[in-house]
Amino acid sequence: ADLGYGPATPAAPAAGYTPATPAAPAGADAAGKATTEEQKLIEKINAGFKAALAGAGVQPADKYRTFVATFGPASNKAFAEGLSGEPKGAAESSSKAALTSKLDAAYKLAYKTAEGATPEAKYDAYVATLSEALRIIAGTLEVHAVKPAAEEVKVIPAGELQVIEKVDAAFKVAATAANAAPANDKFTVFEAAFNDEIKASTGGAYESYKFIPALEAAVKQAYAATVATAPEVKYTVFETALKKAITAMSEAQKAAKPAAAATATATAAVGAATGAATAATGGYKV
């Protein structure tokens, strides 16, 4: 008989998979270790996954049972430790609940995918499905590395850069609203909240995210990424894709500010030098 369903537990893709080393997430300390409770939980689950994967080097027919037998207890322990502390406030409590819900959905989806498979294929189907879902969830916590901003966003006009911070804030508000909505309503709730927040933060100057071409393209790309996705993780895929795009835009903005300042300083210096040279030769300045 199959092992019964338990709390959310991550896994790995099938053959040939090598676990990626998590990058230092936003909010990590100097040593690159996670600092938020959610990031700490994901790190513990990743550690348990690696141990279970290493221990699954058995006959194909026994891989699934061996993996779950090792990973289940490690995962449950991580959850017990991660959720045992008293939340520091409503925000942290809500964040933990959202993460737990996503992990739970990921586990159920992987378990369902493996139903009916032959013993040899059961392990591959289970870990491949759950690994992809967990990769997406980890992405929302910025646990894994993302591409440099230059690779994500080629060029963002100066006018657009000025509002990226407001867009980022609007995204967070919309994501919070969507996380509290029923699964079938998450897309609608997110887009409505996203647009409302952008309109409010710009004093009504803009009605929606579509005033930024690069952002509109990112939203369309994020929606496209969900086409072949199971309903249980559909919104999570969208949220991750859009978050990645906005993060890249934000990083590009940070890089653009010092560059613009340096250019302005250089221009002023050249102007001053030119003026001084003109005056020295008895000429004039406009």
Curated annotation (Swiss-Prot):
Residues 1-34 have a biased composition (Low complexity). One of its GO terms (cellular component) is extracellular region. The keyword Transferase does not apply. Keywords: Allergen, Secreted. Its main location: secreted. It comes from the Eukaryota. The keyword Heme does not apply. It is found in: Secreted. Residues 1-35 are annotated as: Disordered. Belongs to the Poa p IX/Phl p VI allergen family. This is Pollen allergen Phl p 5a. The lineage of its organism: Eukaryota, Viridiplantae, Streptophyta, Embryophyta, Tracheophyta.
